[in-house]
Structure formats: structure tokens, C-alpha cells
Amino acid sequence: MDDIDVYGQVFYSLKFGEAVEQGLLTDYKVVVLAVDAKQVDRDMQKYFKNTDGALDLDDVAKMIGCYKALIKEGLHVNDHQPMKRAVSFCQSIASSKEFSKEFGKVVDAYLSTYPETSNVTCQLDHVDGTMNATEKGKKLSWLKENTEDTCRILSNARCLSEGVDVPSLDAVMFIHGRKSKVDIVQSVGRVMRKAPNKSLGYIIIPVVIPEGKSSEEELKKNPSYQIVWDVLNALRSHDERLNSDINKVELVDNIKDKIEAIQKHIEIVALVDKLPEHSTEATKKSGMGTGGNSSKERGDNDEVRAPKAKQDELELNFDTVQHAMLAKIVEKCGTRTYWEDWSNDITEIANKH
């Protein structure tokens, strides 16, 4: 609708940031989960042994990433209550059915390895365009219901992109890529509805770092990361604040400052583990590699913590993933002439006054 000859001049526009400030929309946060395939492969052997091979390692890793985001593990947010309602977007009806069928099994297997992680149960269902309006309505009503210590997830391919009235929806999860910017914006719009006690809507994007591959190498050539750039670019085209935040990253050198520049709307959570196999027990007890919060020092009891050198290795790997992701976000989603244009605009305004 940018064609003035067809649609005429814009009479009035309300920017996204202004709508949030006026309380018309809920603000959002994009959570990118970078999951280490090596860690998942090691931790999920019980699941792989007992399954029929329906899911591959990437699928399982994404599910674990989604679960950690839903319980807000490792997120820098004021409200630490786990999410209660989410919609997942898959690439097909078949993959959506598989996601809803296997997600709970994957989470159960993961929690059997890390029982201290959370007590939140996930319930899933699937909906698709072949279902009639009554059946779809029942599934949406199920999603709206209030539950205790339970997160309900309704999985679909495309039928929930628009026309979904669930204001209390906490998150949308992009399990697979989406080519259409319109589809992305409509899907994201599901979590921006206002609801009581709702401070943020979350956009969860799990990505996998294959075993033996560096994060920089994967970001350059792995097409599975395209969904990150697509979602951010779609949001950037509608939210002037995100556009500014992404371009601020380019101005600072320190990784901490880069993270703070975008953390209000984008958070990168790296679930990585580079400890050797013989250090697994130490890792589990220290909470490292799992997103855990334990920081127990070795004392009179038998509690063990991984050696400092190994902790430094984990921290370095975590920073490497974040730094690589931030650099690629600026490259893929930033505006190369942003600050030049900004300077020109300021100069023009100053000259007018």
C-alpha cells in the first residue's frame, strides 16, 4: 500500500513503539536459543534408545531449547513465572503432528537427566486447516484455559497465523523457517495482544549448533539460521525501536555492551557444553551446560565443581556464540547507512530551525 497513486497519502500512522507506550499493544522479546547438538546427543541417549527414530538430533535439540525458553531459564526478565500458553509453527501438518506427539516425551527424557530443572508440565495438541470451525474452536478454548504448573502448546503449520483470539498467549515458537514476511508478522502479532498481568510476548527461535562446527562457520552457511534473520527483519520493518537497537550494536566493541544494546527486545541464550565426557558429573553438579543456577563450591561434603579452566572454556564458548550471533544480526538485519541517514536528518532539522 505504498503506492500513493493507488492508495493516496497516509492520513495518520501510529508507530509500533508508540502503540506499546500508549498501552495498546504488549511489548515483545525475541529469544534465540542456540543449542549445542553435542550436549543434546549425550544427554538424550535414553530418549534415542527408546524411540522409533521419528525425530532427528536437530528436532530434539530444538524442543529442549523451546522448553528452556518456556520456563524462562537463563532469560533476563523481571517476570520469572513460566509461560502458560504458546503456539508453535512448523513447516507442515505432518511435522506439526510429530512435534505435538514427541515434545512431551523429549522433555520427560531431558528432565530425567536434569530433574532439578523445572516442575512445569507441557501439554500439547495439534490443529490444522483440514479441521472444521467447531474442532478448531475447541482446541483454541483448550489453549485459553487456566492451568497450574502447566504450559499448553498448540502446534500448527499455518492456520494460526491470523484470526486467533487468545490475548493471554505468552509465546510463539518458530520451529521451522517461514518465507513470507507477512506470515511472520501475522504470526508474531498473536503474542502482542494485551492481557491482564502480561508484561511481554515472547518470540522463541531455537537453532542448533552441529557437533564439530563453529558458530561462526554455521552462521555463514547453514540455511536453518535464516529464520532468525527473517523474523528480525520482519519486526524491524514495523518497529523503529528494534531498528535503532540493532544498529547500536555496531557502535560498541565490548560484548557486554553489545548485549545490553539489544537485550530489551532480543536475547541470545547459548546452551553449550564443551566439557569432555569424563567431566559430565562435575558439570551436572555445578549446573553448567544445562542453564542451571547452581553455584555450589566444593566443601566438606562431596559436592564437586568443574575445574576453573573448564568453566572458563564454557564461558568462552558461550561468549563466542553470542558474539558471532550479534555480528551476524548486524550484518543481516542492520542498515548500513543508518547512522549516516540519522546524521543527515538531524542536520536537516537543525537547518530548518
Regions found by a protein language model. Give the residues of each.
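Conserved C-terminal RecA-like helicase domain
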Residues: 54-156, 178
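Short glycine-/polar-rich loops that comprise or flank the Walker A/P-loop
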Residues: 7-9, 25-29, 120-123, 167-171, ...
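"Short basic amphipathic alpha-helical interaction patches in structured regions
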Residues: 46-48, 101-104, 187-188
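Conserved interdomain linker/interface between the two RecA-like ATPase lobes of SF2 helicase motors
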Residues: 8-94
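Intrinsically disordered, low-complexity acidic/polar segments
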Residues: 39-42, 97, 212-214, 242
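Short regulatory helix/loop adjacent to the ATP-binding pocket of P-loop NTPases
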Residues: 1-6
